[in-house]
Amino acid sequence: MFYSKNAYLSMKEMTVNAQYILNYLLPRGWTKNAICGMLGNMQTESTINPGIWQNLDEGNTSLGFGLVQWTPATKYLNWADRNGLKRDHMDSQLKRILWEVDNNEQWINLRNMTFKEFTKSTKSANELAMIFLASYERPANPNQPERGTQAEYWFKTLTGKGSTGIQLAQFPMDIINITQGENGSFSHKGTLCIDFVGKHEKYPYYAPCDCTCVWRGDESAYLAWTSDKEVMCADGTVRYITWVCVHDENLLYNVGKKLKKGELMGHSGKGGRATGDHLHLNVIEGNKYQGWVKKPDSALAGTELHIYDVFAVNGVEIVNGLGYDWKTSDWVDGSDENNGDDKDKDKDETKNIVNLLLCGALNGW
């Protein structure tokens, strides 16, 4: 639930929207500090309201619109229309902000911090509010310390439980040594499959996340798995994933078996059509196993994903990564990023609201 209308929101309504934004961005790798720094700015810009027009002048596209008051409004509106998104929907505007992070849009590095670095920062919410003000909003009057005060308020007030249960998808081996890459001429033509060898034959690999076995193919020596929940992928995307591990000569599990992240999943091998001991991996988006297709070589049916975009390589030794963009991640499984001290929350809440009113934070722009 969130509020979206061409009107100034009340503190109660802003709190609902602020919590929604926190819950949306935490699982996508943002720190609570960064989110609250941005919220401190959104409060002044829009009363944290995706449906508001600057000065309530609805339809005046030369002015600002939305959470961060994109100006002119067409900067956001045209993008939303091109992507088939509802203009005044909270998710649409948060997707736009995530797109700006990924595409280096809107942000000008005026405080020695990129937009991507901002999203991961553990500096204080107050300081991050000032960085967001300078590098993203860039108003005519840069002297607005109340935005930092507002950021501190949100940091103390919001519960920060948005990422509970989200796990990082971890590469299943402790070594990367590729023998055949994507579109490999031997047996990977047209696919994103990759073959890996371990430090010795029958090398163990482990569950990259909590998952369930959804298919067993004895003739081809493979098991198919789906993540039990959406996972944080190496590229920063939260999604369900389905994958196959092929060539284990002694398949350990049957359909329906559940594994916890880090539990033994299998071993490299020569089962099926293999000329040497290795692990064959292929990953698709979603939580539905759909069988195989020819591309012209065999791959999972569905939207294939680059393995290096899915599995983080934290602690993994890379012997031969074929130059692919393997990534580490600072995501902590189940972390709610709630580093604030809630002991004094109740007695501070009234004082913070009064401070916000005194500094004119609810007047907008």
Curated annotation (Swiss-Prot):
The answer to keyword Plastid applying to this record is no
| List of residues binding substrate | 137-140
The segment annotated Linker runs over 160-165
The record's cofactor note says: Binds 1 zinc ion per subunit.
| EC top class, as a word | hydrolase
| Gene Ontology BP, a term | defense response to bacterium
Where along the sequence do coiled-coil regions lie?
Answer: none
User: What positions does UniProt annotate as the active site of this protein?
Assistant: 45 (for lysozyme-like glycosidase activity)
EC?
Answer: 3.2.1.-, 3.4.-.-
Q: Where is this region: Lysozyme-like glycosidase?
A: 1-159
Give the location in the cell: Virion
Q: Which Pfam families match?
A: Phage_lysozyme2 (PF18013)
- The principal location of this protein is virion
Q: Where is this region: Probable metalloendopeptidase?
A: 166-365
Whether Hydrolase counts among this entry's keywords is: yes
The entry's function note states: Essential for tail assembly and the production of infectious particles. Degrades the peptidoglycan layer of the host cell wall and thereby facilitates infection of host bacteria. Acts probably as multifunctional enzyme that degrades N-acetylglucosamine polymers (in vitro) and cleaves the peptide cross-links of the host cell wall.
User: Mind telling me what this protein is named?
Assistant: Morphogenesis protein 1
- GN (gene name): 13
